[in-house]
């Protein structure tokens, strides 16, 4: 029996255990909640985008956005539904996001479900627009701080990273393009693009979590044009002096043409030592082409026919035809037009260039003065439909972005990758099967032809051998070519034997057959003479024997 004194102790232990479990669960839930709260902005598109994302009202943007599932998944995204259209849609943030302090991570997924031959799949992170701007007015002229994402058309194949920066001296915004950006993946799988903007002026571009490019905002080697302008510029008002001599070399003014310099001597002269080759056919010029005249040529309507000339057939074996002329050769006395040699120009001043002046647009800074992100927009033109945007994220920590990649993108990608692998294996198997069936069909036709060859009358003596070879080939298809060659050799051998060496044996066989018939007839008349005739026949036609070799 259970001791009643132990019941309170057991209940206490159970309560402690339940509290521990509850505390652990609460801890994990809080951690997950904290992780979500760390995202400045996140759009999963699990719910319809209507009334949250605003489609541009501009007439040129006639592409239809749809809330659609990614192919093969239950996960929804924002879909480009029609090809050869312009698209524009925007989502205003609850509060502007500063890009100046600390790390900022921009991340989103795209899936090019029908590929991308010519079009964009990038996102624009818009700056605060002018007063009175409405999301319905979003277009290509709407200012952005950063443009990031895939773009492909013709020779262009890159993941854009462009930032717009306001010049503090001029007030103008300048686009600065990342040099040598990474390429866009060429498959139709989901891919996640991440840009990590760090406080040390570095930016890292990741594709599927793997760093593909690192750059520095202040480096002229990483961005074109450079963020910080040059200190000086060529003076636009400076002009080259009229007496500025840029010629490094000039003709020697004191040089004199030699007296024996013959400018009129020709480059080539007739070779007087040449002799006419024998047998040169002097009286065999080109002849009319007898086959050139069209059959429907009518002299009355089309005029008198003038046949084109062709080479005289008699000239094929001769060194030449027609009138022979001596060839020309290089003239050893040829010098050409005389010109004075060049000397260093004593007045040479070098290649002129305008003088440098202070650049009025020059400024210095330690960090880019990014304008905050006030909205997220997609403004693209594409020839392909099926582009799906999903899981748009802005965060202050790249660990948050990594967590989202692991939980939202990677499971989908793994499924798609496995499916792609199976499809490629199936396609390879189908191609191999098709190739095998094609080869099998060719082999069947080849063997059918070989059987027909075996039935040719003059091959009757070799028919069994040929059939045996063919049947062996049918059992071992990889020997088909060898079998064909073997049969062709047999065929050609017998054919040549028949054409070039078969007449005499045929006559001998006819004579033997004739004598055999006569012998049989005579044997009926006189049985005693049968053996005598046989001996005479053997004496007259002794069999050919191979000489024996001494071992």
Swiss-Prot record:
Q: What's an example GO BP annotation here?
A: ERAD pathway
Q: Name one Pfam family in it.
A: Calreticulin
Which parts of the chain are sequence repeats? 235-246, 252-263, 271-282, 289-299, 303-313, 322-332, 336-346, 350-360
Region of interest (Disordered), ranges: 226-330, 510-551
Q: What does this protein do?
A: Calcium-binding protein that interacts with newly synthesized monoglucosylated glycoproteins in the endoplasmic reticulum. It may act in assisting protein assembly and/or in the retention within the ER of unassembled protein subunits. It seems to play a major role in the quality control apparatus of the ER by the retention of incorrectly folded proteins.
Query: In this UniProt entry, which cysteines form S-S bonds?
Result: 118-153, 315-321
Q: Which residues bind Ca(2+)?
A: 44, 75, 390
Query: Where does the record locate the signal sequence feature?
Result: 1-26
Alphabetized PROSITE patterns for the sequence: CALRETICULIN_1 (PS00803), CALRETICULIN_2 (PS00804), CALRETICULIN_REPEAT (PS00805)
Ranges for region 4 X approximate repeats: 235-299, 303-360
Carbohydrate attachment residues: 140, 478
Just give the chief location class.
endoplasmic reticulum
Expressing tissues: In vegetative and flowering tissues.
* Segments of skewed composition (Basic and acidic residues): 234-269, 276-295, 526-539
Gene Ontology CC: one annotated term: endoplasmic reticulum membrane
Q: Which residues lie on this side of the membrane: Cytoplasmic?
A: 502-551
Name-wise, this protein is Calnexin homolog
Q: How does it sit in the membrane?
A: Single-pass type I membrane protein
Q: Give residue spans, biased composition: Acidic residues.
A: 296-305
Species of origin: Pisum sativum
Localization, per the record, is: Endoplasmic reticulum membrane
> Which family is this sequence assigned to?
Belongs to the calreticulin family.
Q: Which ranges make up the Lumenal topological domains here? A: 27-480
Region ranges (P domain (Extended arm)): 233-364
Q: Which UniProt keywords apply?
A: Calcium, Chaperone, Disulfide bond, Endoplasmic reticulum, Glycoprotein, Lectin, Membrane, Metal-binding, Repeat, Signal, Transmembrane, Transmembrane helix
Q: Where does an alpha-D-glucoside bind?
A: 122, 124, 144, 151, 379
